[in-house]
Amino acid sequence: MANIRKTHPLLKIINGAVIDLPTPSNISAWWNFGSLLGLCLITQVLTGLFLAMHYTADITLAFSSVAHICRDVNYGWLLRNIHANGASFFFICIYLHIARGLYYGSYLYKETWNIGVLLLLLVMMTAFVGYVLPWGQMSFWGATVITNLLSAFPYIGDTLVQWIWGGFSVDNATLTRFFTFHFLLPFIIMGATMLHLLFLHETGSNNPTGLNSDADKVTFHPYFSYKDLLGFTILLAILSALALLNPNLLGDPENFTPANPLVTPPHIKPEWYFLFAYAILRSIPNKLGGVLALLLSILILVVVPVLHTSKQRSNTFRPPSQTLFWILVANMLVLTWIGGQPVEHPFIIIGQIASVLYFMLFLILIPLTGWLENKILDWA
């Protein structure tokens, strides 16, 4: 009699996805981040669900309800700290996951990659509306500044902003709808994640060499299930340490002050994981130009597969392309730093140079280097 996991209609899908899945034997720890993102998503949904049971989406009560969760609800402080810092870890894992894809040429699985870019946009949207919910100063002013950017679109801009606000300013209607979106989007993310996996399992995983690995595959379980378990342990250990020992390290002190429309904070800035995009937005003096640059800083990932010029898939055997990849990483760190600095000399010019370099790397330098490497191979 055949094993039930191979015959049962539901179990055989699970079996094909996480048990008997043929996996390249040489994938490294960089392939752990997909499952870590799954862990982050589950953690965020569970902590978020329990927080939503005690949260009140009303401007007179939102700030107090968060204080109530932290003071009066059993382990409410822990739920909140894990949820807030879990978002940071979510983005760390996403950025490392994307970096892995860029380095090893995983983006050539176009369907998987495009769903991944969509997932990134959904997660960013979810994090943005979630940051507004505690209704502190930075929540309120962050919502005001970022939604106001839509007014840069010609003709429809002002109407669009008022439509999103539900009035003439960020108010109760805005908070209520942001809570609705923050509750709904993670379930859409879960659906998109299943599509992401569906497309991935059509082709199988890439590997560090970028070569076809059909000749050397092993079952996902037990080899990579245990390897993933180690990643889970490390992630949860670091997340727990941060949530328990220094939960406000990555937050903004301004958000401990209840929202006040009459007092503007000295420096309005988003959470650290949006700072690179915020720096690109601020480095362009024109409002519409800034908004377009902000959008393109993420959407540029969609054109990466089209601009792949090299005969080799992975960067493993391409030192010039490796150099450009690490310049891109350093550039992202510079942009993140600039995004948190005030708009004054020398930060303005540094931000502008870093922004130009960011787009140049994707659109010109990396494709050109791939082409040059092909030429060098031909000469050799």
Curated annotation (Swiss-Prot):
Annotated residues for binding of a ubiquinone: H201
GO annotation terms (biological process): mitochondrial electron transport, ubiquinol to cytochrome c
InterPro entries found in the cross-reference section: Cyt_b/b6_C, Cyt_b/b6_C_sf, Cyt_b/b6_N, Cytb/b6-like_sf, Cytochrome_b, Cytochrome_b_C_euk/bac, Cytochrome_b_N_euk/bac, Di-haem_cyt_TM
Transmembrane segments: 33-53, 77-98, 113-133, 178-198, 226-246, 288-308, 320-340, 347-367
Keyword Cell membrane: no
Membrane topology summary: Multi-pass membrane protein
PANTHER family per the UniProt record, alphabetical: CYTOCHROME B (PTHR19271:SF16)
Known role: Component of the ubiquinol-cytochrome c reductase complex (complex III or cytochrome b-c1 complex) that is part of the mitochondrial respiratory chain. The b-c1 complex mediates electron transfer from ubiquinol to cytochrome c. Contributes to the generation of a proton gradient across the mitochondrial membrane that is then used for ATP synthesis.
Quaternary structure note: The cytochrome bc1 complex contains 3 respiratory subunits (MT-CYB, CYC1 and UQCRFS1), 2 core proteins (UQCRC1 and UQCRC2) and probably 6 low-molecular weight proteins.
Name of the protein this chain belongs to: Cytochrome b
Source organism (scientific name): Atractosteus spatula
Gene behind this protein: mt-cyb
